[in-house]
UniProtKB/Swiss-Prot annotation:
Active site: 316 (proton acceptor)
Annotated protein name in UniProt: Nicotinate-nucleotide--dimethylbenzimidazole phosphoribosyltransferase
UniProt keyword list: Cobalamin biosynthesis, Glycosyltransferase, Transferase
MF terms in GO: nicotinate-nucleotide-dimethylbenzimidazole phosphoribosyltransferase activity
Pathway in which the depicted protein is active: Nucleoside biosynthesis; alpha-ribazole biosynthesis; alpha-ribazole from 5,6-dimethylbenzimidazole: step 1/2
E.C. numbers: 2.4.2.21
Length: 348
């Protein structure tokens, strides 16, 4: 299997349903625009779903776990063993995203792409093993071509499963010690930014730790300066879980499944996905603005205005999950409010 599928055409939102939804908003018992962005969200979901009655009840959340070779450079406040330990925590339902998924009634898929502290087979974890970790990006490319292909395909597999369940919204999350370093390096390469602009605290680095992370990213960028395409930059600087998110976003757009993007790492993956296949952008909505330093720059590059700003920096799809009730409220208002004619209320 090649990577050619990632360049395939994306679905197109329904312009007729967008117009119909806009027309309904104008007739609801409220001043025009009084519900602000909630009105825009309802219209957007209606166009995505090709329906006059948009809904965000069937939600698929996929969390991809993978380790990074660059962790050997000391770029995280936590040991690498945490990635595997968190996979167990996801499976047991103790992680933040597991709690949120239960609260939302969402399907939670956890995918183990390769961790150093391997928990083995777990009943609630899909094993899509590639390697114990990527290679150290300061020494060599993060992935081989085959590993990149497999990681992209792992994300696409999630979408195939989600589509079979008639999913109305896909949310991608990640877990991997060292992945803010990989995401920052990838963002720098794609946006021609200096590492100081994108490298942040990650799991809780102090100023000295962030300065060291900047040095590590600078070394990685110098080593891979000849990577000239988004796909090659992903292969050299990314991670298994970042590539899986890229594959999931592209496959979702091709399948016509809306995507709610999480924080810094998920947004780095979204940037790669849109560079590889520009049609993906129409299917992306951004859940929140992370506290991670580089997130704002990535959002600007995508012309994205996130729904929330709560100073989150956990990952796991947690910030996007917190935004889902806003989408549900937008749809409920759109579907349930009376029109002026129905309510016998005078229009302006």
């Amino acid at each position: 299997m090649s990577n050619d599928w990632i360049f395939g055409a994306c679905a197109v939102p329904d312009a007729r349903m967008r117009s119909a939804a806009l027309a309904r908003q104008e007739q609801l018992t409220k001043p025009p625009g009084a519900l602000g962005r909630l009105e825009q969200l309802a219209v957007q979901v209606a166009a995505w779903q090709r329906t006059e009655h948009p809904a965000v009840q069937r939600v698929w959340i996929a969390v991809y776990a993978a380790d990074h070779g660059v962790a050997a450079e000391g770029v995280s406040a936590f040991p690498q063993a945490v990635t595997g330990e968190m996979v167990r925590n996801f499976a047991r339902g103790g992680a933040a995203i597991a709690v949120l998924a239960r609260e939302l009634g969402a399907r939670l898929e956890v995918v183990n792409l390769g961790v150093v502290n391997d928990p083995g087979d777990l009943s609630r974890v899909r094993r899509a093993w590639i390697a114990p970790s990527t290679a150290n990006i300061c020494e060599q490319p993060a992935m081989t071509a085959t590993q990149l292909r497999d990681a992209l395909a792992a994300g696409a597999h999630s979408i195939a499963q989600a589509k079979s369940c008639d999913t109305q919204l896909f949310v991608g999350g990640e877990m991997g010690i060292g992945n803010t370093t990989a995401a920052a390096a990838l963002g720098c390469a794609l946006l021609s930014q200096f590492p100081q602009a994108l490298a942040g605290a990650g799991t809780g680095l102090d100023a000295e730790g962030i300065a060291h992370k900047v040095t590590v990213i600078t070394r990685a960028l110098a080593l891979h300066a000849d990577a000239s395409t988004p796909l090659e930059r992903l292969r050299r600087l990314g991670g298994f879980e970042i590539a899986a998110l890229v594959g999931a976003y592209i496959a979702a757009a091709q399948a016509g499944i809306p995507v709610l993007v999480d924080g810094f790492i998920a947004t780095a993956a979204a940037l790669v996905a849109t560079r590889l296949n520009p049609g993906v952008r129409e299917w992306l909505l951004f859940g929140h603005r992370s506290q991670e330093r580089g997130h704002a720059a990535l959002l600007r590059a995508l012309d994205a205005e996130p729904l929330l700003q709560l100073d989150l920096r956990l990952g796991e799809a947690s910030g996007a999950a917190v935004a889902i009730p806003l989408l549900r409220s937008a749809c409920a208002l759109h579907n349930g409010m009376a029109t002026f004619a129905e309510a016998g209320v005078s229009d302006a």
